[in-house]
A protein has these predicted regions:
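Interfacial helix-cap and linker-helix signal at transmembrane-aqueous boundaries
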Residues: 47-52, 78-81, 112, 165-174, ...
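12-transmembrane solute porter fold
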Residues: 20-36, 41-42, 99, 269-439
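Helix-loop-helix hairpins in multi-pass membrane proteins, especially solute transporters
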Residues: 76-77, 81-214
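Extracytoplasmic
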Residues: 17-76, 126-127, 298-302
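Hydrophobic transmembrane-helix bundles of small-molecule transporters
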Residues: 173-285, 290
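Short hydrophobic/small-residue motifs within alpha-helical transmembrane segments
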Residues: 65-70, 156-157, 324-325, 421
């Protein structure tokens, strides 16, 4: 888009828009798009009460949106060359707005999941269009370690702030108003695009030939099958239910078909060479371990704050401000040390897992009935800080893959796990462990309580039952925090046992001219075949 050593410009803007203002308008568009989605998981409880859907239904729709976002990365450069910027933003804004209206008015679960999936895909498309437009403004050297710091600053900040906005609307009026607000914001964005953007093409046009659409759909089915098993497993009693067995079979079959097709078709959605590259499974494993260690933030923290400490939704969501500060500090630290000073991947990951271990150790030693709200600030801050470092370091490491195809496929696989699958897998493992351990602890705590025990004789049964459950919950959380702390310590030792001096020195994004040439060479046989048939 921009030639080296030339002044940065965004040619799709009309001439009356000041040059200094153009990147900030694009960032505004990114923020609006990142706030949007099919469903808003912060309002899950309110949606369950209003729509009579299961909690699992809402979670399935929310994570389906993240799967749609991840799958877009497999074709991100192709759509950049195929569609004009103005058309992209208008189309994506319109689709996401319609998805919001449908999501707030339907109780049909397949429709809700499908709409959320589509909304996630177009949300990522609009985000990539905007971010790629201002990449040279953010980092003139095209340093992806710098660029990814910006990406996670925007994405994670939007997650925290959208949760706050959702609860604000839910308390003030109804969760529906969050959808109305997002639709209005998207309409404003579309109006600005129509007024400020020229209908021009800033990239050489390349048609969408040679894209494995069937492969993309099957990878999506595989991911959604994993989500279904993890989210609905406890509800349906795992593989005793035909629903879970069917989803498992569907996931295994589509995964096998994808790998089989990738062995002989010309342009598979994910090449086998990408999956064989050592950096891809390593990054996926790191993200799964990190998400397992951070799973208590999704389960234990809410159980502690709601069930034990008695916080309402406003008090719980206000802690997102602490996570927001942790995001900013984590991004600044990563930018200064990793992007600027080029600290090694090993050092950054050791720091990140140390922060996560501090989070686990804090709750292991401090968890109690009477924790003040201020006592939760430190662990929430350090877990967010640690996660940001892991995410940026892992994503940057994928630049070792060749551009453009292997890189974008590696990013797709990493995002498929980091955004959706790893978190759900981690939460499922910890939730299952919590159920088993809590049942055991409740049995141990209540084994001496009977109708002739003087200590419990005059205590009402329901009060006694509630006390046992609360105590069993605290004992269970403490025990699992301890287990996870040992896993975190083992991860730190494994990362530090062998010195690695690999640093993010050659993480430069190629120019779009170079990428377009590679894509043109890739699709030229397909174009020749189409011309012959015509």
């Amino acid at each position: 888009m921009h030639a080296p050593n030339q002044k940065f410009e965004i040619p799709q803007f009309r001439s009356f828009v000041p040059e200094w203002l153009r990147p900030w308008i694009v960032i505004l568009f990114v923020i609006i798009v990142q706030f949007s989605g099919g469903v808003y998981l912060a309002a899950t409880s309110e949606m369950v009460g209003t729509t009579q859907l299961l909690n699992e239904d809402i979670m399935m729709a929310g994570y389906a949106s993240l799967v749609g976002m991840a799958l877009f990365f497999g074709m991100m450069f192709r759509v950049k060359f195929a569609v004009k910027p103005r058309t992209t933003l208008l189309m994506c804004g319109g689709v996401i707005a319609v998805a919001n209206l449908v999501a707030m008015n339907t109780t049909n679960v397949p429709l809700l999941v499908g709409v959320s999936f589509v909304a996630g895909f177009f949300r990522m498309w609009a985000t990539f269009e905007c971010n790629s437009t201002i990449q040279l403004w953010l980092t003139p050297k095209r340093d992806l370690s710098v660029f990814f710091c910006y990406v996670y600053l925007i994405v994670n900040s939007a997650i925290q702030l959208s949760g706050i906005a959702t609860i604000f609307f839910s308390v003030w009026a109804s969760w529906h108003f969050m959808h109305y607000f997002i639709v209005a914001a998207l309409l404003v964005m579309m109006l600005l695009v129509m007024l400020l953007y020229k209908d021009i093409r800033v990239m050489p046009h390349l048609p969408l030939y040679g894209i494995d659409w069937l492969g993309m759909i099957m990878w999506g089915i595989t991911a959604l099958s994993v989500l279904f098993v993890c989210l609905y497993g406890e509800h349906y009693d795992w593989w005793y239910a035909w629903q879970i067995r069917t989803a498992t079979l569907c996931g295994v079959v589509t995964l096998a078909l994808n790998l089989w097709r990738a062995s002989f078709i010309r342009h598979p959605y994910i090449m086998l060479d990408t999956l064989k590259s050592p950096i891809v499974p390593i990054t996926i494993a790191i993200m799964i371990i990190a998400d397992v260690l951070l799973a208590p933030s999704h389960i234990f923290e809410h159980a502690l704050m709601e069930g034990v400490l008695g916080y309402d939704a406003e008090n719980i969501i206000s802690l997102n401000w602490v996570a927001f500060v942790g995001t900013i500090v984590g991004v600044l630290f990563t930018w200064l040390t990793f992007a600027r000073r080029k600290w090694s991947y090993q050092r950054m990951l050791v720091i990140a897992f140390t922060a996560i271990a501090l989070y686990l150790a804090y709750f292991y030693f401090v968890i109690d009935y009477n924790l003040p709200k201020e006592a939760l600030y430190f662990p929430i801050f350090v877990r967010t800080f640690g996660y940001i470092i892991v995410a940026v370091a892992v994503l940057t490491s994928l630049t070792r893959l060749s551009f453009p195809f292997h890189f974008m496929q590696g990013v797709m696989m990493q995002n498929l796990f980091s955004a959706s699958l790893a978190g759900v897998i981690g939460t499922t493992i910890v939730a299952r462990a919590m159920k088993v351990v809590m049942t055991r602890n409740a049995a141990w705590l209540s084994e001496g309580m009977d109708s002739i025990s003087l200590s419990t004789l005059r205590t009402p049964f329901m009060a006694l039952y509630g006390e046992v459950q609360v105590q069993a919950l605290l004992e269970t959380m403490k025990e699992i925090y301890g287990w996870l702390l040992w896993v975190a310590i083992a991860a730190i030792i494994a990362l530090g046992v062998r010195y690695s001096g690999i640093r993010p020195r050659h993480v430069i994004h190629p120019t779009f001219r170079v990428i377009s040439k590679a894509v043109r060479v890739s699709i030229s046989p397909v174009q020749r075949l189409i011309r012959r048939r015509a």
